[in-house]
């Protein structure tokens, strides 16, 4: 059995590893490499895939979405070699790193893609639940933000119902953070001014 000090150091190391990986601002890197300038200067000022899409480059937005998700997946899977607790710590670190990246003044994305990536790495079946909830909500309401909020709300409930309390607790915390990061979107949804999927601007 590992000593408590070693165990704690391992968890801290996993958290830091995940944070550093999650801090990579792929949206900013890709738009600059494509000659589109600083994505933070357009739209919402966000570095995530939704704002990258506002450049008009769908392929770049898709690449941003995939890479932002893979940050979470990679962090969780690599750390999983040291046990589930390390994987959870690394996944959470990647999520926080995406939200508050050290490289660009701690101003990152809203975390949905990395949330999904961590979910894929820790509980792939939960990722299917997320995808189903997102798609159904998007088809019915046509709001990307609402779809993400509903999907993230369903995940911890689904995980808890399957008896995985540790992961349910992790994603419940992450869901609360996702809601906080989307508070402007929630306000616009309530006011009827949120942009729908496919809308310009």
UniProtKB/Swiss-Prot annotation:
Subcellular location per the Swiss-Prot or TrEMBL entry: Cell inner membrane
GO annotation, cellular component aspect: plasma membrane
The EC number(s) this enzyme carries: 2.3.1.275
Pfam families cross-referenced by the UniProt entry: G3P_acyltransf
Spans traversing the lipid bilayer: 10-30, 60-80, 86-106, 116-136, 166-186
SMART domains: G3P_acyltransf
Protein task: Catalyzes the transfer of an acyl group from acyl-phosphate (acyl-PO(4)) to glycerol-3-phosphate (G3P) to form lysophosphatidic acid (LPA). This enzyme utilizes acyl-phosphate as fatty acyl donor, but not acyl-CoA or acyl-ACP.
Similarity remark: Belongs to the PlsY family.
Name of the protein in its database record: Glycerol-3-phosphate acyltransferase
Species for this entry: Brucella melitensis biotype 2 (strain ATCC 23457)
